[in-house]
UniProtKB/Swiss-Prot annotation:
One of its GO terms (cellular component) is cytosol. InterPro entries: Ribosomal_bS20, Ribosomal_bS20_sf. One of its GO terms (molecular function) is structural constituent of ribosome. It comes from Helicobacter pylori (strain Shi470). Keywords: Ribonucleoprotein, Ribosomal protein, RNA-binding, rRNA-binding. Belongs to the bacterial ribosomal protein bS20 family. The keyword Ribonucleoprotein applies. SUPFAM superfamilies: Ribosomal protein S20 (SSF46992). Binds directly to 16S ribosomal RNA. Coiled coil: none annotated. GO terms for biological process: translation. This is Small ribosomal subunit protein bS20. It comes from the Bacteria.
């Protein structure tokens, strides 16, 4: 265990940040999964609705500093391509 106050504080901070990061990581995965599930069953309306939500949420995470801008853009772009694919089919 830590012998210094500063080391104990760093441990507390790491635990807190790990929990926060896990929460957001799970949220990102669930958002993407929701869109992919709608695409899998070829439900265009639901997929487009969920894509709109995903776009908003992922870019909100960018503004909070959770995701990098290019990462969010890449994820949205790939989701958009999959939704567009079923919309045209």
């Amino acid at each position: 265990m830590a012998n210094h106050k500063s080391a104990e504080k760093r441990i507390r901070q790491t635990i807190k940040r790990t929990e926060r990061n896990r929460f957001y990581k799970t949220k990102v995965k669930n958002i993407i999964k929701a869109v992919r599930e709608a695409v899998a069953v070829n439900d265009v309306a639901k997929a487009q609705e969920r894509l709109k939500i995903a776009n908003k949420e992922l870019h909100k995470f960018v503004s909070k500093g959770i995701l990098k801008k290019n990462t969010a853009s890449r994820k949205v772009s790939r989701l958009n391509a999959s939704v567009k694919k079923i919309a045209l089919a």
